[in-house]
Amino acid sequence: DSNCDCQKTLLANIKTNMLLLFHSKINFFMSEQQKNYYLKNVSKLKNKNNIVISSAFCDKDMSTIKSQKIDNKNDTWLIQKSNSWVKGTKNSIKYATEKKLNFKLFENLTREQMLSLFASSKGFIFLPNGFDTCPRTIIEAKLLGCEIICNDYVQHSQEKWFLNKTSIWDKIQNNKVEFWNIIKDHEK
């Protein structure tokens, strides 16, 4: 919501997050950068079990992605329209305009519609104003053959698993199994 009292909300979220992190048996993070940020800034977490698990995809979503035809790409760059300042829609529009890229804004699509749009488009521009630990849209766009333009706020963008489609598939297929194995190990 663009009208949120962000400072008050952020402070409340930080306090809640710290309570959860301090009292948990395991802390799951969405990216290495996110984990490292917390370890650097919250020394009490260094002795905790901190694990990067990333985004999770259900079998239906993975099947839908695999079923998309990606051999007929147009020259359109996609930008997700959002009223949330952190998503950086204005940054993405400015970038596309300055680079004279053919772009299209999208919003309020079903997952299937969005995946189909990614499958037929050249690329996806996402330039958030703040940390976005592991945005699914970036992962889905890359799996569907889109070129990606993003900034350092997309925290997983430089991680090894995100460098190519094969390693992305391997990562998301293993995430669910890895997560439940970790939970089972800690229940003992």
Set out the residue ranges of the language-model regions.
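Catalytic binding pocket for nucleotide-activated donors in carbohydrate/polymer assembly enzymes
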Residues: 127-188
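Short acidic alpha-helix that forms the nucleotide-activated donor recognition element
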Residues: 111-121, 143
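Membrane-proximal helix-turn-helix segments that form the acceptor-binding/catalytic region
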Residues: 2-27, 119
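Short, flexible loop segments at the rims of nucleotide/cofactor-binding pockets, characterized by
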Residues: 3-10, 102-105, 125-127
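Short, well-ordered alpha-helix to beta-strand connector turns
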Residues: 23-26, 74, 120-122, 145
